[in-house]
Amino acid sequence: MRDPLAATSRNWKGVARRGAAVVVVAGVAAIGLRELVNSSTFQLFGDYVARVETADRVVALTFDDGPDPWNTPKVLDVLDRQSIKATFFMMGRNVERHPAVAREVMRRGHEIGNHSYSHPKLVWMSPGRVREEIERTDKLLRDIGVSGDIHFRPPHAAKFIVLPCVLVQMKRLSVLGDVDPEEWKRYAAPVMTESILRQVRPGSIIGLHDPNGIETLRTLENILPALTTQGYRFETVSQLVRRRS
């Protein structure tokens, strides 16, 4: 005679196994989605660049989150001493607060890009909100004299469906990067220096943050002569992008 308790036990074990499988698949999917959303080198669609394929030893040096009245001028001085031009992806609200610093970046011959107005994660925002973040910053940059194409870099490198859709509609390039020393972890300059020099390749886009403090400045002072000694030249993002086939 069939034991109903044993049958029930087997059924529950089957349910438990299927439930565990669902949890595992959901967990893997969530991790994959998070990696996709926050990837600094990949975007689902649209025109984007994280590195340019080239045999020439050229790199683009980029700075996010400025302008900052204390640290951005120090970064500019370090770049001036090496005669190097970079690209600064600025937050609109910081341009609004410190327009003179933004103009100084431009006066010294550097490129300026758009890093949104308020630095939100644009992943789950409506298309209208995303467009407002971009267009509001565009206007502020035009007001200080920026001309030509204004490239865009997603805050937190976060993007999924909505942001690429908006950028496609606006015919805008999304600038990511393949060299990230993870400044947010508060590493010391020697650690970040080693990380950058290990990751860099011809056509790389290096990501730093000009509002960060002394460790970022020391890292910059380390990598510029080191990369120059290795035969690298520095270009703006626009110059590097023109090398794409």
Name each model feature, range by range.
Residues H151-P154, R244:
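Cyclic nucleotide signaling catalytic output domains
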Residues V25, G66, M91-R93, Y117, ...:
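Active-site beta-loop-alpha junctions enriched in small/polar residues
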Residues M1-T62, P73, D77-T87, R198-S245:
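Terminal accessory/targeting
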Residues A158-Q199, Y232-R243:
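His/Asp/Glu-enriched short active-site or ligand-binding loop at hydrolase and phosphoryl-transfer sites
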Residues A60, G113-S116, V175-P181, S204-H209:
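Short beta-strands and strand-loop turn motifs
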Residues V37-R129, E133-L140, G148-D149, I214, ...:
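Active-site beta->alpha N-cap acidic-glycine motif
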Residues P73-K74, A100, M125, V162-C165, ...:
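Generic recognition of short, well-ordered alpha-helical segments
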Residues V123-V146, L163-V175, T193-I196:
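Soluble catalytic domains of enzymes that build or remodel membrane lipids, polysaccharides, and related
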